[in-house]
Amino acid sequence: MNVGITCYPTYGGSGAVATELGIALAQRGHEVHFVTYKQPFRLPTFLPRVFFHEVDVGRYPLFEFPPYDLALAVRMHEVVREHKLDLLHCHYAIPHATSAWITKQMLKEEKRDIKVVTTLHGTDITIVGQDPSFHSITKFSIEKSDALTAVSRYLQNETLSAFGCTACRIDVIPNFIDPKVYDRARYDGQLRAQFDGNSKVLMHISNFRPVKRIRDVVRVFAAVNQAVPSVLVMVGDGPDRGDAEKEARELGVDKRVHFLGKIDSVAPLLAAADLFVLPSNSESFGLSALEALASGAPVIGTKAGGLPEVVRDGETGVLCPVGDVEGMAHAAIAILQDADRWQTMSRRAAADARERFAMDDIVEQYEDMYKHALA
């Protein structure tokens, strides 16, 4: 198949999943064309059967806001025609599914067709899509898709609740990991020594937005460090970074907290982690949690959104109510102070991630969906 993929290319779960899916499809013999405004951050410079088509958003004084959705539709139309695409796979509904529908209408005028598959990732439904400014166009765009997926049962239910979507079927296809990449044994432990070879390593990876509650990450760490000598590694960047740095200074742990900024390849870092901390208000899936589990790092998180579908509470991690810093810290301390328990949870985490979320199995589900949409 010739597949077009549109996603947000910047740091974040939806773009990472879309890119990894495209690479995996190309490895299985498909031709993949990424159509977006910038090369996706996880896409290498060159791979066989993988192509990148940049969207040029013209800037004119008349437009206060450049019309990316229209420019994207034009570029999609060009790529479909030039490369004879079989389908467009849109990751994140707004504006990608809308642009794909416009493309579909343009092709219809030429007596041609393109199938549109839309994957819902989270905030496109739970936040952006429910904004009154976008609600009706979000509902329209996803209902006009030829196939529709959500990354978790939680998000499937949220979509049905918020939009009805009686005219469409939503299949759940979860995010995935490449077991070979997230293999703790692949990495030599040098990164761990750089942090502090004698301390436990707690880690957090996100876009540092309010929903991630990264000040809670620092608070949990401060409590853990009082009982178990530890360091905290913070990977990512975003609007709440300054508040987290301030929190670390006020709690007197700033010398033991490492802010590394955005890093594309997180597997070597996760191989050095003893625990992964994710105290979010909500997670539609929790890709970073899955990557941590696959690396053998138990997750301390919240009973929020789709996270309980990823983390088996009490087996591969511990989930607490949102905002329960004391509970999360207590759980982390209990695990870190019991070497046998940590080993058991670490093994279970890695095994469960591979059993339920292995790349080959999930990519095959997408291939089956493509075939069904094209039938």
Where are these regions (language model features)?
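N-terminal strand-loop element at the rim of the active site
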Residues: C7-Y11, I23-Y68
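Nucleotide-activated donor-binding/catalytic signature segment of Leloir-type glycosyltransferases, i.e.
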Residues: E245-G261
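A short, well-ordered alpha-helix in the C-terminal region of glycosyltransferases
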Residues: G327, A334, R341-R356, I362-D368
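Conserved acidic donor-binding segment of nucleotide-sugar-dependent glycosyltransferases
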Residues: D313-G314, V318-V325, A334-A339
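Short hydrophobic beta-strand element within catalytic cores of glycosyltransferases
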Residues: P298-G301, V311
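Carbohydrate-associated surface elements
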Residues: Y154, F176
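Aromatic "clamp/platform" in nucleotide-sugar-dependent glycosyltransferases that forms part
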Residues: K262, N281
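Conserved donor-binding/catalytic core segment of Leloir-type glycosyltransferases
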Residues: T149, F195-F221
